Regions:
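Conserved acidic donor-binding segment of nucleotide-sugar-dependent glycosyltransferases
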Residues: 112-119, 127-132
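A charged, aromatic-enriched C-terminal amphipathic alpha-helix characteristic of glycosyltransferases
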Residues: 130-163, 167-171
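Short, hydrophobic/aromatic alpha-helical segments in well-folded domains
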Residues: 19, 85, 124, 141-142
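Short, flexible helix/strand-to-coil boundary loops that buttress conserved ligand/catalytic motifs
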Residues: 108, 125, 139
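CheY-like receiver
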Residues: 61, 124-127, 162
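Nucleotide-sugar donor-binding catalytic core of glycosyltransferases
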Residues: 1-110
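Residues in well-ordered alpha-helical elements
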Residues: 56-59, 87, 119, 133, ...
Length: 174
């Protein structure tokens, strides 16, 4: 069964990442794994569980939590690189509250709750708290899409196909 915890996995890099600060200000049951947060959070530093978590431990954490918070670094947004943890969280059936990223919204228009400011972040939290089963159902509907298009195996197969294509097209280079 799902717990009550909101999760954030990521380093601060000395940057006040808004979704984390808003969650702390709102006294949400946030648990953080990442470096650089204790100094930034002051009295809320008890939210920091550790500066690191093994990748092998993340799925169990995702399966036991209520929701995860996500944001993208500016360069990721500039180039529309979707944070890979979103796929991991959704594959584990975990709802995601994320900043707006056009590429992400194109992939998951309904399965992720999006914010672009503090008010929208609060609306996402209200949606989680008031309509959790509906949000969770939208997340669970994504499993076939994730498995078919975004699994490790699918991505590895695509990379091999790209390499093979270029090797064949450029056989004169060999």
């Amino acid at each position: 069964s799902r717990g009550k915890d909101y999760l954030f996995i990521g380093n601060s890099r000395g940057v006040a990442r808004p979704c984390v600060l808003w969650a702390a200000q709102d006294k949400l049951p946030l648990k953080i794994w990442g470096a650089g947060w204790k100094a930034m959070l002051g009295p809320d530093k008890t939210m920091v569980q550790d500066v690191f978590i093994e990748n092998s431990q993340i799925p169990a954490l995702y399966r036991s939590a209520r929701v995860t918070l996500n944001d993208h670094w500016k360069d990721m947004l500039d180039y529309q690189f979707v944070n890979n943890r979103i796929f991991d969280a959704l594959a584990c059936g975990l709802p995601v509250i994320s900043d707006c990223c056009d590429e992400l919204r194109e992939i998951f228009p309904e399965a992720v709750l999006y914010y672009s400011n503090k008010e929208e972040f609060h609306q996402c939290v209200k949606e989680i708290e008031n309509n959790y089963e509906e949000v969770k159902a939208k997340v669970d509907e994504q499993w076939p899409v994730i498995k078919e298009k975004y699994s490790f195996e699918t991505r590895a197969r695509e990379l091999v196909e790209i390499v093979e294509k270029h090797r064949t097209e450029n056989s004169w280079l060999q």
